[in-house]
C-alpha cells in the first residue's frame, strides 16, 4: 500500500493518477467497510498491502487493518485496527496506529444515538497517543438498497500526549486535553454489483478559549475480485489547527491494497 507522507506526494505518478481518477469517477467515496445485515452475526475483514524498492530509490511501505462488525434490528457495534509504516531512503516518513470502537442504537427508522472511542498514535507528528471519546445523535437522511447517507452531531473529549513536550495553545505541554463538538456526515454507495464506496467527514471544534479545530476525511473505493477478495484504494486527510511546533497541520495519505473477507 502506498502512503503520502505529510506535505509530500507519492513518487508513483501513474498510481496517483489512477487513484484520483477512480475517486473522481464516483459521487462520494476510509478503508473498506464491512457490509452488515441485521442478523446478529459478526462479520470480519482483514486488509494488507506492501511495496519495496531498492537501487536508485530505497522505499518500503506496509499497511494492515482489521475490522469486525455486528448488526441487529436495534443496534450496531464495530471494531477497527490499523497500522501504517513507510520509509524513504532509510528515513521513516509514516508510522502510526489507530484503534477504534463504535456503537449505534436505532431509536426509529431515521434517528439513532451513537458512542465511539479512538486511540491514535502518530510518531512522525510527535503524537505519543490521542485518546478520544464522543457520544451524540444521528439522522438517517436517505436509505435505499444501494445508497445511504446520514448526518450526526455530538460532544466528546480528546487528550493528546506528546513524545516530546511542544508548544500547544501558547504553552509548553506534555499533554493537552479539551472538550470538542463532533459534527459529521457519512455515506455508503453500491455503485455496481462488485463496486462499493464509502466516505466520512467529521469536524471537531474545541470548546475552549483557544478555539482549536480538527477535521478528518476518509474515503474508499472497493472492487470485488471474488466473493471474499477485493482491491481497495483509499484516501485520508487529517487536519489539526494547532498540532505543535514543527508539525504540519494537514496530513494526507493515499493507500492501495487488498482485503480478505474472513467471515460472511
Label every PLM stretch briefly.
Residues 224, 250-264:
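Outer-membrane beta-barrel "beta-signal"
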